[in-house]
């Protein structure tokens, strides 16, 4: 069963799609990380519905944000109740809130296979750029993800099983996993060319999950991935799956001219 998480501050929502079932779950979290300072990750944003954090994302300009397509679904797609917080290590305070003007989900996003799990948010007003608010550096189109590279993930997911979102930004670093090794672990679903994997296979204990969906995954200062889906969190048997940003570089440019 595929599991991904849209973590709300105080509630969880479950819905089913066709096989495999896709389930939100408030008990999955970033594990094995530590507190982070937004100055070190100034592209990170908190994607919020009615002022409650439920997904991550990252700035690519002063008016555009990238997140996961699965973060935008029925019940959480009403733009009048969507906003982002920038420039703060805390999702609930400081920095500045910005309204979402519109969103664009990838036209080929598949909720069953989780392929093309990417979306864009256009902000109503531009953010003020400073040391805590800065667009991410993106890879070039077609850039591949090396095996065993150190992937850094940030987000506000809970820090223990069954917990709520963490109020302070968390960071964790895990290695990328060879695509064939990953596919041998993820036996019931396909790892497409638009995805890559990361995790401590055989060890576990560190991972991204709830509240981190849509957030940035960074290698050498570039945001190369988007937190997308997985069978579990921090499980030594299963790596996490990330949307490969370089596979969508042309689409991002077509929609945003960035």
UniProtKB/Swiss-Prot annotation:
The active site is at 70 (charge relay system), 117 (charge relay system), 213 (charge relay system). Keywords: Digestion, Disulfide bond, Glycoprotein, Hydrolase, Protease, Secreted, Serine protease, Signal, Zymogen. Pfam families: Trypsin (PF00089). Glycans are attached at residues 110, 130, 188. GO terms for cellular component: extracellular region. The record marks 207 as: Required for specificity. PANTHER family: AT26814P-RELATED, POLYSERASE-RELATED. This is Trypsin. It comes from Phaedon cochleariae (Mustard beetle). The lineage of its organism: Eukaryota, Metazoa, Ecdysozoa, Arthropoda, Hexapoda.
């Amino acid at each position: 069963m595929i599991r991904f998480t849209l973590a709300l501050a105080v509630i969880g929502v479950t819905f089913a799609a066709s096989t495999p079932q896709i389930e939100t779950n408030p008990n999955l979290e970033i594990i094995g990380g530590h507190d982070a300072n937004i100055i070190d990750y100034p592209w990170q944003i908190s994607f919020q519905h009615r002022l409650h954090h439920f997904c991550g994302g990252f700035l690519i300009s002063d008016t555009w944000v990238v997140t996961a397509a699965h973060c935008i679904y029925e019940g959480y797609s009403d733009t009048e109740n969507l906003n982002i917080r920038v420039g703060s290590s805390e999702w609930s305070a400081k920095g500045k809130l910005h309204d979402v003007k519109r969103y664009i989900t990838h036209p080929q996003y598949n909720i069953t296979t989780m392929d093309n799990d990417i979306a864009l948010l256009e902000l109503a007003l531009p953010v003020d750029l400073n040391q805590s608010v800065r667009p991410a550096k993106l890879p070039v189109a077609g850039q591949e993800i090396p095996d065993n590279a150190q992937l850094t993930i940030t987000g506000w997911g809970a820090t223990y099983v069954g917990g709520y979102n963490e109020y302070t930004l968390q960071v964790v670093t895990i290695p990328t996993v060879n695509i064939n090794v990953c596919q041998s672990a993820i036996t019931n679903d396909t790892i497409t060319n638009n995805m890559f994997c990361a995790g401590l296979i055989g060890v576990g204990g560190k991972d991204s999950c709830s509240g981190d969906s849509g957030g940035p995954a960074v290698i050498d200062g570039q945001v190369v991935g988007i937190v997308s889906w997985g069978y579990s969190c921090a499980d030594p048997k299963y790596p996490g799956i990330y949307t490969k940003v370089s596979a969508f570089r042309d689409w991002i440019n077509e929609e945003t001219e960035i």
